[in-house]
């Protein structure tokens, strides 16, 4: 009898929490819904709100964003065609564009920048690029050749398996860029996404798209933020753009790219640091390998040929057999403490790697089967909005709700999983399980006949 009462109490609490989280969702997206309500029929706006919740409920990497699957969750299996038609009308409506949701993400980035302003801490805008692969598709609009990261990963040599790797594989797909706003600690905020192609009438290239975004960020946040770029941005053209826009940056330089030393010599990055001992050592946590590494740091003044202004090269050595980080920055370095700030700032770049992986694997960004580019970008923008909400649940003020959700709807025996500071995967699974068991009252009642 006691166990029955406990289960009944948990069930009542779960139904209440399902409504609470649904209300939090509405509060999160209310500003953008209000703007869309001025342009769209209220039924389409309601479909957008319902679709956001249904996307969280439908967890499947291959079919997560297939409209027929989403339609089945929206109105129930018996009315799946009607649910699919509702979503299709929303995505194909000519009265709104994906830019409305992308602008809303920019505003969330503005809020994050204002929230993170602190005299002793920097604010980071972390960039990274990726691709969305559609290897079996030929009919979708704006498909272009992209280098398959999946094929590259599968062709790595494994111990005991002797098939030699081949050259790079190129498949149909789209290019993709993502920006996060983050502080020295805590979760990052999704601020912007952009997709483009290299073929057709809308053909563009990476540097053109990235330059447009850099100019927009420079106008928006100026020198309040520090830009974090990986090796894909290394080179004189991009450094020149950063200097022209007067932005603060930390760029991981390639070891074989040349720099000019204070003596006027033109040397590769590794040659600039050759023979110089580290100035200091400390333990740095490796987010990727989940361990601490004894890391040494060295910094020296350098210049990039054809680029005006003094820059600094910070070298972080994390042990024998591991490639050092060569970090190029225009931040003034006067002591070792300033050099460590650069190293710790770049270590935050792992946040955007996790965000891209989460978008692809957990939110199924590569699964849509839409041909029209406008409809496709609208769906991606809606999913990005869902991702932004899930990240917002990591706020410290929501810790009791988050803890309850994980304990009751995604309990795990693994100690490492229980101690994860940002359990986004478990959080989405728990929320999906909760809403499937206790459907929010804001969603249409499913028809089972």
Where are these regions (language model features)?
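Active-site-proximal, Lys/Arg-enriched surface segment
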Residues: 52-58, 88-184, 296-301
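Short coil/turn segments at secondary-structure boundaries
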Residues: 67-71, 103, 356-362
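Short, contiguous clusters of charged residues that form electrostatic/catalytic patches at enzyme active sites
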Residues: 68, 174-177, 208-212
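Single, function-defining residue in the core of a domain
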Residues: 2-47, 56-61, 120-121, 138, ...
